[in-house]
Amino acid sequence: MPGPWRPYIADVIAGNCDTYLTDFADAAAAFGHPVLMTFDHEMNGSWYPWDATDGGTSTGVTPAQWIAAWNHVTSLISAIAPNVAWVWAPNIERGGSAVSAFWPGSGGQVSYVGLDGYYVNTGTRWANRFQSSYLDVESASGGSCPFMVAETGIPAGDSNAVFQIDNLLSGARPAGAVAVMYSDKGAYAMTAAMQSKFVADAG
């Protein structure tokens, strides 16, 4: 989208990006197949310009503004392209970044509740990386939407990587995850052994 980041959220809320959004929605509708979309994901992290975790001190974006922008974007696009499904995707919580502050409520569209998070070392497990945040997103949403792991990866060079594939899917399955989106690139690109384990366990 056009424009610098600080006024960008305000521009979205004000409707100044509606032409761009409408063009996208028209293209998505013409595509005619299901499309999974998110908007300004990982909003509770500190690495994107739409970070709203400190009440706007760093980026000028507050949780309330982020929600207003989400609701505007999702409502506009969904009215034109009902084939677009929306994934609300905060990052796993990392101190002071509670997801509940960013739940859009009933003012916009949420089709799936997602959670982004990566395994970082041999000691990473679903229980110590995802579980508490999973419970929080379910609480924030009231269990109103299906859950998915919206973005994840496991370091391919980790000697424990194949086991961690099993751990990831073993944790996601009881959580009722309908999908696990794996970022198969860079340091997280799967080895043949990881691919085989993923396919076998996912089945």
Describe the role of every protein-language-model region.
Residues 51-60, 100-111:
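Short, surface-exposed, charged loop/turn segments at secondary-structure junctions
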Residues 1-88, 183, 199:
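Substrate-binding cleft of extracellular glycoside hydrolase catalytic domains
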Residues 44-49, 94-97, 122, 156-157, ...:
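Short catalytic/ligand-binding loop motif for oxyanion handling, primarily in non-cytosolic enzymes
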Residues 35-36, 145-203:
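Substrate-binding cleft of secreted/luminal carbohydrate-active enzymes
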Residues 105-159:
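Glycoside hydrolase catalytic-domain groove-lining segments
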Residues 40, 70-99, 115, 144-157, ...:
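Aromatic-lined carbohydrate-recognition surfaces of secreted/lumenal glycan-active proteins
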Residues 27, 72-80, 109, 136, ...:
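Alpha-helical structural signal in soluble globular domains
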Residues 19-24, 90-105, 124-139, 162-171:
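Alpha-helical scaffolding within the catalytic cores
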